[in-house]
Every structure is written in structure tokens, then in C-alpha cells.
């Protein structure tokens, strides 16, 4: 396995662990969301919205962790890439379309993580596509 894919796997595990922490925080205290993320319109944040956000974050976390474990599973790889695309779209729309988020560290951090992850996973696709060919050459 290429060194890049090993780094990507480590990155996915780290992002997954952080997301699990965010999940716990969303279930524990919904004020976390309007103090850190949705500072533009904090009155729209309630317990139900926080728990929904928590479940979405947990699902993304599990998918990313599974991809780190089985990075050669192309279907899982593409689904994982979509979790980052959806997160990026969500936070950009909350920031620029709906106005529920302000450009604070709480929003800029997930935007950066999603952007770097998308970039890394797109680069990783080239390594995934190249690997089976190099494995076949070694066998012959």
C-alpha cells in the first residue's frame, strides 16, 4: 500500500474520532451548536436539531472509520468522499445562503477539514487505481 494511502487512512481515523466527540457533545448539550457553529441565528437551534446533527455526524464518523479500515473498497471510498462533499455543502450553505452560521473558527474548521479531506481523497483515487496494476505486475 502506498504511503499516501496510509496517511489518508490515519487522517480518516483522526477525523472520525473528532466527529464522535462532536456527536457526544451534540447529545449532551445542544448549546454547543449555537455557541460554536450556528452563531448567526442561535434561536433556531434546539435539542431536536442538535440530536439530528449528532446522528448525521455519527453516521459520517462510522463511514469514515470503515473506509480507513477498508480503503480499497471503492464503493465505501466514494461514499466517504460524499460525506465530506455533503458536509462542505452544508456548512457553506449555512454560512452563505441561510445565514445561520458566521465565519468563526467553529465553522471555518469543519470547512477546512472537509476541503482538505476532499482534496486528499481525490488524490487518493489515483493511488487506488494504480495499485492493482502494480500488484499484477509483481505477480507476472
Swiss-Prot record:
UniProt GO cellular component terms: endoplasmic reticulum membrane; transport vesicle
Protein name per the record: Ergosterol biosynthetic protein 28 homolog
A GO MF term: identical protein binding
GO BP terms, alphabetized: sterol biosynthetic process
Family the entry assigns: Belongs to the ERG28 family.
InterPro entries with a match to the protein in the record: Erg28
Membrane topology field: Multi-pass membrane protein
Superkingdom of the source species: Eukaryota
Subcellular location: Endoplasmic reticulum membrane
Pfam families, alphabetized: Erg28 (PF03694)
Record-annotated membrane-spanning stretches: 4-24, 52-72, 79-99, 105-125
Key words of the record: Endoplasmic reticulum, Lipid biosynthesis, Lipid metabolism, Membrane, Steroid biosynthesis, Steroid metabolism, Sterol biosynthesis, Sterol metabolism, Transmembrane, Transmembrane helix
Organism: Mus musculus
Main subcellular localisation: endoplasmic reticulum
Amino acid at each position: 500500500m502506498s504511503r499516501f494511502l496510509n496517511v489518508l487512512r490515519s487522517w480518516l481515523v483522526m477525523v472520525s474520532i473528532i466527529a464522535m466527540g462532536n456527536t457526544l457533545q451534540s447529545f449532551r448539550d445542544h448549546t454547543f451548536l449555537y455557541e460554536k457553529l450556528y452563531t448567526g441565528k442561535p434561536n433556531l437551534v434546539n435539542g431536536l436539531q442538535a440530536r439530528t446533527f449528532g446522528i448525521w455526524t455519527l453516521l459520517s464518523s462510522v463511514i469514515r472509520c470503515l473506509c480507513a479500515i477498508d480503503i480499497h473498497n471503492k464503493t465505501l471510498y466514494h461514499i466517504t468522499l460524499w460525506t465530506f462533499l455533503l458536509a462542505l455543502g452544508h456548512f457553506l450553505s449555512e454560512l452563505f445562503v441561510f445565514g445561520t452560521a458566521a465565519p468563526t473558527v467553529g465553522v471555518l474548521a469543519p470547512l477546512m477539514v472537509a476541503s482538505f479531506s476532499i482534496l486528499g481523497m481525490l488524490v487518493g483515487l489515483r493511488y487506488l487505481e494504480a495499485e492493482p496494476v502494480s500488484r499484477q505486475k509483481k505477480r507476472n
